[in-house]
Regions:
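Amphipathic alpha-helical binding modules
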Residues: 69-104
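Amphipathic alpha-helical interaction modules
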Residues: 23-70
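Residue-level detector of well-ordered alpha-helical segments, enriched
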Residues: 17, 41-44, 67, 88-92
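Short terminal alpha-helical segments
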Residues: 1-40, 93-102
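Generic serine detector
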Residues: 2, 8, 12, 44-47, ...
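Short, solvent-exposed segments of well-ordered alpha helices
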Residues: 5-16, 36, 58-62, 66, ...
Length: 104
């Protein structure tokens, strides 16, 4: 883990934040599946990704971490793709989770 944290940010708070982000990242898959099953326009999926991406941008401002930047890039790419399948979404979600676990 990088050492350029804001001094007031305690390690345990940061670890809890990363665990929360892991849970939120996992939630991407069922949200996408619900949209695909209902043949929606994926507005709720994109809205959820927007919020998660915003949180990660903020966290990367506080704690410069290469793995968080990688997750940001992957989630933004996920948001931009139109050829998604359940298999692709699952693969990207679990790759992001693996990266986040390495932060903690």
């Amino acid at each position: 883990m990088s050492t350029n944290k804001i001094p007031s940010l305690e390690l345990s708070m940061y670890e809890a934040f990363i665990e929360d982000i892991i849970g939120k990242t996992f939630k991407i898959l069922p949200i996408w599946e619900d949209c695909a099953a209902e043949k929606e326009d994926f507005e709720s999926f994109n809205s959820y990704l927007d919020k998660l991406i915003t949180m990660l941008i903020g966290s990367n401002y506080i704690q410069k971490e290469e793995k968080i930047y990688s997750v940001l890039v992957m989630l933004k790419g996920l948001q931009q793709r139109e050829d998604l399948t359940q298999r692709k979404v699952k693969s990207i979600v679990f790759h992001c989770i693996d990266l986040l676990k390495k932060v903690n």
